[in-house]
């Protein structure tokens, strides 16, 4: 029969290939004892709790120590040889995660968006100053300066501008042409109505011929001969 000390010695000396990288019950027992001794005072600023219990990483390997000698060596390990590590994503109370703004790099949560075309147009109209009118070229230049491609967004630009004019937000505008006066537009409208109703346009004289022959034209080179009435 084996003695109890012999069994303890056999358990404390695992094979060489399993000495590192595998679970060792003796080392787990000793590590738990050292953990309780180290963390009994106030934890260091970098100390933390992972799963309710602090965990440590021993920097000094225990090669060459077996059995009771390993236990004594573990008990005399200095605190400077133990590094308390952080769990992933955990920080002690009162300590914030260092942001990139503290190092001088400014980060934006959302990418900076360009203002809409309507806002750019309204801003250009509001900033016209003493000028009474704003040309279409000025509006296009303001939109293109914001970052829009006018060659691709020409149709969208006209639609937005027409919508603003219909709402009355941007006043009236002319697309490079002179608007006719109201009196000229009224005369033109009256002429169109007369032509549709069949009335004779203003300034056209009545034919000298009879009403029956008024719309008939005489053929060139043909003369009418006077009729003689014989009694």
Swiss-Prot record:
Gene3D superfamilies: Winged helix-like DNA-binding domain superfamily/Winged helix DNA-binding domain. The keyword Transcription regulation applies. InterPro entries: Histone_H1/H5_H15, WH-like_DNA-bd_sf, WH_DNA-bd_sf. The modification Phosphoserine is found at residue 135. Keywords: Chromatin regulator, Chromosome, Developmental protein, Differentiation, DNA-binding, Nucleus, Phosphoprotein, Spermatogenesis, Transcription, Transcription regulation. Residues 177-214 are annotated as: Disordered. Transmembrane segments: none annotated. Residues 179-194 have a biased composition (Basic residues). GO terms for biological process: chromatin remodeling; chromosome condensation; germ cell development; heterochromatin formation; negative regulation of DNA recombination; nucleosome assembly; regulation of DNA-templated transcription; spermatogenesis. It is found in: Nucleus; Chromosome. It comes from the Eukaryota. One of its GO terms (cellular component) is male germ cell nucleus. Residues 113-177 form the H15 domain. Expressed exclusively in the testis. Its main location: nucleus. GO terms for molecular function: double-stranded DNA binding; histone binding; nucleic acid binding; nucleosomal DNA binding. DNA-binding protein that may be implicated in chromatin remodeling and/or transcriptional regulation during spermiogenesis, the process of spermatid maturation into spermatozoa. Belongs to the histone H1/H5 family. This is Putative histone H1.9. It comes from Homo sapiens.
